[in-house]
Amino acid sequence: MLKRLHIYFKEMYPFFSRLLLGFIVFGEIYFILLLNYGVTDFSLGIQEIVGGITVFGFLMFLRIADDFKDYESDKRLFPDRAFPSGKVYKKDLNIVVAVDLAVLTILNAVFMNNFLFYLFLMAYGILMSLWFFQKHKISKSLPLALVTHNPVQMVLNLYIISFCCIKYDLYPFTLTSFLVLMTLYFPALIWEIARKIRAPKDETEYTTYSKLFGHKKSTIFILILTLVDIV
């Protein structure tokens, strides 16, 4: 099993780079919020480490959940990937998910001050993995999948912001916290749409925004989102 998981994670979720990303995402929102609130007296400790690990572990859960959800289509479109090719078994990944969620839950219950926000984050992720109980509708509509799934980045941002506000006794309902929440959400939204835009000659059976709306309109929409994010 360990060899199979090594193949999977090397291909789909490289540990070191994703762990580093987890701490970068947590630290980025953490320090931008403190900077804009004018907090200069801050302390780093086990809670910040748990926060970074939570981002890493949650994104790993989403990665595996996506592989479960897309198994049938991946067998046709991406047959060489670790899961659809049989290089790793579903039972292997189920064990990883169980251990991952158990460890994250224990760490957050013991060390973090925003456990309710953690539960909200996990509830949203689990609902995503189940297509919000509307697979027959969402799986057939790329825009509907975007509307229901992409806000998870905002929920993840909210988890980090809530921790900071509680730890440093900051009033949460301000324009500052709202802008931090939305500003750091847009890069994820832009990336999610942009990665599904292709030139006409590169289109395949895979559903893309360029196939649905044309590559020109899709590209213009990305430019508009980028300008909104900058402003």
PLM region descriptions:
Residues M1-V231:
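Multi-pass alpha-helical membrane architecture of UbiA-family
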